[in-house]
Amino acid sequence: NGEGELYIVFDEIMQGDNINFTRLTTASVVIIKAKTGKFSFLSAEPYTYRYIRIYSKNMKCTVNNLHLLRVGAPEVKKVLDSDNKKLQAIYNAAIETYRQNTFDIYMDCPSRERAGWLCDSFFTSRVEKALTGKSEVEHNFLENYILPESFKCLPDGMLPMCYPADHYDGVYIPNWAMWFVVELREY
């Protein structure tokens, strides 16, 4: 019929020979509805993966030039010049973690928790300042909490645990908002 679907599933681990794309209670899948013929596609969301598999439904396909477009904090210019290979590996992993978890705001984990959580931000903001000498992402992060007049499902004057995308299910940890005060003091 000239139309079909491509399913791109992905995850950070394999379970046997399979990719369990709902393992993290998320849907780690991109669905493309396409007509027969050549086309290009770009998906712009903060995915993380190590393994990827493509399935087709109602169409034959050939995939060319599949690649990841890197999105994250700019490359960090600070380096650790150490003869200790383990220490160097830890440092490099820390830089990589910072870059993946810092884009427009601080994220707990871009594959699972894409909102900015207070508490995490307190520590990540220190890393941003140490690595870049700036607090630009922290400014954006804190501003998200300051701009709204109120927050749905919270008492007046109280801040959410994470924003955007706080929990509206009655689960609330009040001391999480206190991290805002501690972070704002250092800012």
Segments predicted by a language model, with ranges:
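Non-transmembrane alpha-helical segments in soluble domains
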Residues: 95, 125, 142, 146, ...
